[in-house]
Design a protein with these regions (language model features):
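Acidic donor-binding segment of Leloir-type glycosyltransferases
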Residues: 1-21
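Catalytic donor/gating beta->alpha subdomain of glycosyltransferases that bind UDP-sugars
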Residues: 126, 134-195
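Conserved nucleotide-sugar donor-binding
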Residues: 35-36, 114-127
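Short aromatic/hydrophobic "clamp" motif used to bind/position activated sugar donors
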Residues: 39
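Conserved donor NDP-sugar-binding/catalytic core segment of glycosyltransferases
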Residues: 50-83, 87
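Glycine-rich, basic loop-to-helix element that forms the pyrophosphate-binding segment
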Residues: 18-34, 55, 104, 108
Length: 289
């Protein structure tokens, strides 16, 4: 779905220019043009495993399955700073209940998948398209939430694999994290998207805890407890950074620093998104979203 017309020497491909709109609107245009029963979404900075579609489509043999997909892992050729970003997202204390989006885990039903690796029944997508595509990022959360009503299934299969190039640490990675935090704060205020909503408020609490710790170290009676809490957190992120860096073949110091900054930036973004109660309004106006 390019912005402008594109000519390809392949008669099997149907290219539909969408105009300068965000990815959520591009998906809606594609769904309205095609007559296929199943829509497959992937990002332009991702590429699929050769068996991606076969491993995902097989789940739709069950009529109760409405959405299927798998992880978007870090490509082996990414730069060291990109691999550090992938390791940060692979950390259990960063992505928590959404970790399956970034690493291969066991097959199971989940409450949400990332739109960079997501297949959905076309009728289910179109039924709620206007509601879910109002937001970006975050439209994949609403899509899965709406699609999985009335006992429908969202299936995660590690064999339905795509490779997703990461944003290099620290600038590009943290800008992405800020955007994620903003939409999560907005959703926490306006919408209940899953039973895991409380987990997403933890980084915001972490930011507020920084303020409390700074206040505590100025008080002799609380100074010991403040140092103990800071030491426990440092040990936790150190352990997690080493595990993630080893698994993703990334620089542990970049991962350690990145986990800490990701917690701060995501938490601050969550607070701002919740306080403003809006979802990137300037960008929506710019793109007609």
């Amino acid at each position: 779905m390019p912005d402008d017309p594109l000519v390809l020497d392949n008669e099997r491909l149907h290219v539909v220019p969408s105009g300068p709109v965000l990815p959520n609107r591009k998906r809606q245009v594609a769904a309205e043009v095609t007559t296929a029963e199943i829509l497959a979404f992937i990002d332009d900075d991702a590429y699929p495993d050769p068996d991606w579609l076969a491993n995902a489509v097989r789940h739709f043999a069950d009529p109760n399955v409405v959405v299927a997909g798998g992880p978007a892992v870090t490509p082996p050729g990414d730069s060291p700073r990109q691999r550090a970003s992938g390791a940060i997202f692979a950390s259990e204390i960063v992505t928590a209940t959404t970790r399956h989006r970034y690493v291969a885990e066991r097959q199971r039903d989940v409450y949400g998948l990332a739109s960079c690796n997501l297949l959905v029944r076309r009728d289910a997508f179109l039924r709620d398209a206007e509601a879910s595509v109002r937001y970006w990022p975050g439209e994949d959360i609403l899509l899965c939430m709406f699609a999985a009503r009335d006992g429908a299934r969202v299936v995660y299969d590690p064999a339905a694999l795509v490779y997703h190039h990461r944003r290099a640490v620290f600038g590009a990675h943290l800008r992405q994290v800020w955007s994620y935090g903003r939409f999560r704060g907005f959703f926490l205020r306006r919408l209940s998207t899953s039973q895991h909503d409380g987990v997403y408020a933890i980084p915001a609490a972490f930011v507020l805890a920084h303020v409390a710790l700074l206040a505590a170290v100025t008080r002799p009676r609380l100074r010991g407890a403040a140092y103990l809490a800071a030491g426990a957190y440092a040990a936790l992120i150190g352990w997690s950074a080493l595990r993630a860096a080893r698994a993703e073949r990334a620089n542990p110091w970049l991962v350690l620093t990145g986990i800490y900054l990701t917690h701060l930036v995501y938490g601050a973004g969550t607070i701002v998104g919740w306080l403003r109660g809006d979802h990137s309004p300037a960008e929506r106006r710019k793109h007609g979203n």
